């Protein structure tokens, strides 16, 4: 097929019928990632690396405006109408901190391949009209009230405890030169002064084929797929947005080659100004603690989020080990952290969750504690530190750890059977955003079972060493 060059192809080692291929257009730089497996549904995730250094919410506003029509189909509702004819449940999208993805799921491939070029026309060549901006993003209504779909959505979120704590964490971890610091949904104060011209400029820069990937999941006829992809690639050339495989001169890959690639910082004594707001207290080397106020009628409880810097994103074994360790610590009423904080006469919280955000520079591990009694807010992270040190001194319950590992294997295989598109899409989107462009990093990303085999050989000492390195001796950020 003219223009689309083979980059990478691999079978899943533990599921040979599942194959992943990656291509990159030599004419436009458009990346295509295709996971092939038998399934009645076909999924697409049109993904763009959307880097923004302000709180204007431009990536989020674009996500909404795309659905209002395109150059070839300048009417709202065209996508939903076509989706119904293709046995699809409409179209959808999400805006994350580092990307925007537009989703399509259809029953069967015929309607899917007919709809994909239409969907891409909406994403890459939207109308972006003044009237669409006024209705969808921001306006003042007849009652002299702030209004607009995006504005109203963020009005409902901006002052929630979860959003306030997450934004404060981002502000503390990243310097002002990093896009990870931004509120990509848009703060209300910024949305009120945003203009359609700013959105058009952003779209022209980031909604380009060299900064986009079409992630496909499901069974498709190769010849028909390449025909559809070729029509999409040709459209870029026709519209003059094709700037070659590597983009225009001076183009830098978002998050990977820009200032956002700088690792986050918790130890504020080593890099002046990184992640520090003027009103925040000075940090010490092992603990930075900040407070966030949010509107709440019940002042008897609060929330606590503790963050540590994790390994780099390419250390997949260490990341999977930390994921398993987090499950061991929190997954059930018999887990150590549930026993210590929840399953007691006077609970110190009602729920605990440990997860990680995989970002350029370093990943970030975060433990979230819900509904913490106000009297315990100041002491919770110290209580956690004492518990973790006690676990290290007593050792890991290896019988239970083996059970956790076995259950995690079974959960992955079950998801691969029941929801394969979800399993593949996360890995493939991550590879597009941060992976090596020749596809050589995919082999390791897809081989979860090999890593489970390696973790099966971990001793109690190996697990406690991991716990000590990342959750005890590592500097922590405490947001209360």
Kindly give the residue locations of the regions a language model identified.
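Short, small-residue-biased leader/transition segments that mark boundaries at the very start
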Residues: 1-8
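Histidine-acidic residue clusters that define the catalytic metal-binding segment
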Residues: 18-22, 154-159, 163-213, 222, ...
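Active/ligand-binding-proximal structured segments within catalytic/core domains
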Residues: 36-78, 82, 316-329
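Short, hydrophobic beta-strand segments
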Residues: 46, 104, 304-307, 363-371
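A generic structural motif
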Residues: 50-52, 106-110, 218-222, 310-313, ...
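Acidic/histidine-enriched segments that form metal/cofactor-coordinating
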Residues: 69-71, 78-202, 247-251, 306, ...
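An aromatic/glycine/proline-enriched structural segment found at the starts
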Residues: 213-302
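C-terminal regions of mature proteins
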Residues: 218, 404-480
């Amino acid at each position: 097929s003219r223009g689309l060059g083979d980059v990478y192809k691999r079978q899943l080692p533990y599921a040979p019928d599942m194959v992943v291929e990656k291509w990159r257009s030599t004419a436009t730089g458009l990346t295509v990632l295709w996971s092939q497996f038998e399934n009645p549904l076909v999924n697409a995730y049109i993904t763009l690396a959307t880097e923004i250094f302000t709180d204007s919410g431009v990536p989020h506003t674009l996500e909404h405006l795309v659905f209002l029509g395109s150059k070839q189909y300048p009417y709202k509702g065209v996508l939903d109408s076509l989706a119904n004819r293709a046995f699809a449940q409409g179209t959808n999208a999400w805006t994350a901190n580092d990307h925007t993805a537009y989703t399509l799921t259809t029953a069967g491939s015929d309607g899917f391949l007919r709809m994909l070029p239409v969907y891409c026309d909406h994403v890459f060549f939207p109308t972006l009209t003044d009237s669409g901006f006024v209705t969808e993003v921001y306006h003042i209504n007849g009652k002299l009230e702030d209004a607009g779909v995006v504005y109203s959505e963020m009005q409902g979120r901006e002052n929630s405890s979860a959003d306030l704590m997450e934004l404060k964490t981002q502000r503390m971890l990243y310097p002002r030169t990093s896009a990870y610091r931004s509120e990509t949904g848009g703060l209300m104060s910024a949305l009120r002064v945003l203009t359609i011209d700013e959105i058009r400029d952003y779209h022209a820069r980031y909604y380009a084929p060299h900064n986009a990937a079409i992630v496909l999941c499901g069974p498709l006829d190769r010849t028909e797929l390449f025909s559809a992809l070729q029509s999409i690639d040709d459209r870029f050339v026709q519209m003059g947005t094709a700037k070659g495989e590597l983009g225009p001169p001076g183009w830098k890959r978002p998050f990977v080659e820009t200032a956002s690639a700088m690792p986050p910082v918790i130890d504020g004594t080593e890099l002046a100004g990184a992640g520090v707001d003027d009103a925040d207290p000075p940090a010490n080397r092992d603990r930075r603690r900040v407070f966030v106020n949010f509107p709440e009628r019940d002042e008897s409880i609060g929330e606590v989020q503790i963050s540590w810097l994790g390994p780099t994103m390419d250390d997949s074994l260490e990341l999977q080990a930390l994921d398993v360790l987090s499950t061991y610590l929190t997954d059930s009423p018999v887990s150590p952290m549930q026993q210590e904080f929840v399953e007691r006469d006077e609970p110190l919280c009602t729920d605990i969750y440990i997860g990680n955000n995989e970002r350029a520079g370093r990943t970030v591990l975060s433990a979230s504690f819900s509904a913490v009694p106000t009297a315990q807010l100041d002491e919770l992270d110290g209580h956690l530190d004492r518990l973790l040190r006690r676990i290290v001194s007593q050792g890991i319950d290896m019988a239970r750890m083996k059970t956790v590992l076995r259950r995690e294997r079974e959960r992955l295989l079950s998801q691969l059977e029941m929801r394969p598109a979800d399993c593949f899409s996360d890995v493939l989107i991550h590879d597009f955003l941060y992976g090596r462009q020749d596809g050589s990093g995919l082999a390791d990303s897809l081989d979860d079972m090999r890593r489970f085999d390696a973790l099966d050989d971990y001793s109690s000492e190996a697990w406690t060493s991991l716990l000590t390195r990342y959750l005890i001796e590592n500097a922590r950020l405490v947001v209360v």
